Curated annotation (Swiss-Prot):
Pfam families: ATP-synt. PANTHER family: ATP SYNTHASE GAMMA CHAIN, ATP SYNTHASE SUBUNIT GAMMA, MITOCHONDRIAL. This is ATP synthase gamma chain. GO terms for biological process: proton motive force-driven plasma membrane ATP synthesis. F-type ATPases have 2 components, CF(1) - the catalytic core - and CF(0) - the membrane proton channel. CF(1) has five subunits: alpha(3), beta(3), gamma(1), delta(1), epsilon(1). CF(0) has three main subunits: a, b and c. Belongs to the ATPase gamma chain family. It comes from Leptothrix cholodnii (strain ATCC 51168 / LMG 8142 / SP-6) (Leptothrix discophora (strain SP-6)). Keywords: ATP synthesis, Cell inner membrane, Cell membrane, CF(1), Hydrogen ion transport, Ion transport, Membrane, Transport. The gene is atpG.
């Protein structure tokens, strides 16, 4: 029963794989919950700093920070591409990088060059393969994104925009919608949206809040605009990490379920093979007994 022994070996191998994927599914589920908590915890800060920034902008209409000024003429844009460091998360990276590719083709057709910042090994590898200009990178962020690890790489593009050397800065990441659904996004980071700031200013005005700024509103807004842009980037990275763990959990669950189905099929084949071998042996015994008799 050499065939039966081989099938038993395959069953054992698939069972071991199933144990691994099940463990990875459980780990991803735990990390997903923590990533969602971090993502939600970052939102109030981003909302509050946007409201204060909007209030400042309304209070100083004569001053326009470089981040809200629309640049033109450089023929260069920046792209912050957020992906994962590890794989085994379904088509998440593939989907966002496909969106990045389409955006780059659109910009190239318009004669616009791209300077990229890669956050995550998968995006960095992709950019290197296509020969894109990578001005900075941040990899091996771990399961918890720290702003101090992101500030250095992204500050390169923020400074270039403030100096008027970039026409726009885009951020590409995977937005977390729910456990089963994540959506790749390409959003304009700079110049900051006038519509979003105007809406926040209207909300502030409806509350009737006012502030006294020291040393002056312009000095405060210079600092807050940078913090606001950094908060938006951090929020995108946090959403990407929540999406990663959700996609990995779903992928590992699918792998575990597929392993279970394969084990069932292999056991059926094994039983049929064993039954055929027993039937053959019985036939040989009966034939031998008949020949002797």
């Amino acid at each position: 029963m050499a065939a039966g022994k081989e099938i038993r070996g395959k069953i054992k191998s698939v069972e071991n794989t199933k144990k691994i994927t099940k463990a990875m599914e459980m780990v991803a589920a735990s990390k997903m919950r923590k990533a969602q908590e971090r993502m939600r915890a970052a939102r109030p800060y981003a909302d509050k700093i946007r409201n204060i920034t909007a209030n400042l902008s309304r209070a100083t209409p004569e001053y326009h920070h470089p981040f809200v000024v629309k640049n033109s003429g450089s023929g260069v844009v920046g792209m912050i591409i957020v992906t994962t460091d590890k794989g085994l998360c379904g088509g998440m990276n593939t989907n966002v990088l496909r969106l990045v590719t389409n955006k780059m083709r659109e910009l190239d057709a318009a004669g616009t060059k791209v300077q990229a910042v890669a956050i995550g090994n998968k995006g960095l590898g992709f950019l290197n393969r296509i020969g894109a200009k990578v001005v900075s990178q941040a990899t091996q962020l771990g399961d918890t994104p720290h702003l101090d690890k992101l500030i250095g790489p992204v500050k390169v593009l923020l400074d270039l925009y403030a100096e008027g050397k970039l026409d726009a800065v885009y951020i590409c990441y995977t937005r977390f919608l729910n456990t089963m659904k994540q959506e790749p996004q390409v959003e304009q980071l700079l110049p900051l949206s006038d519509e979003r700031l105007s809406q926040s200013a209207a909300e502030q005005q409806s509350h009737g809040w006012d502030y006294i700024y020291e040393p002056d509103a312009q000095a405060v807004i210079d600092n807050l605009m940078v913090r606001y842009a950094e908060a938006l980037i951090y929020q995108s990275v946090a959403e990407n990490m929540a999406s990663e763990q959700s996609a990995r959990m779903v992928a590992m669950k699918a792998a575990t379920d597929n392993a279970g189905s394969l084990i069932g099929e292999l056991k059926l084949v094994y039983n049929k093979t064993r039954q055929a071998a027993i039937t053959k042996e019985l036939s040989e015994i009966v034939s031998g007994a008949a020949a002797v008799g």
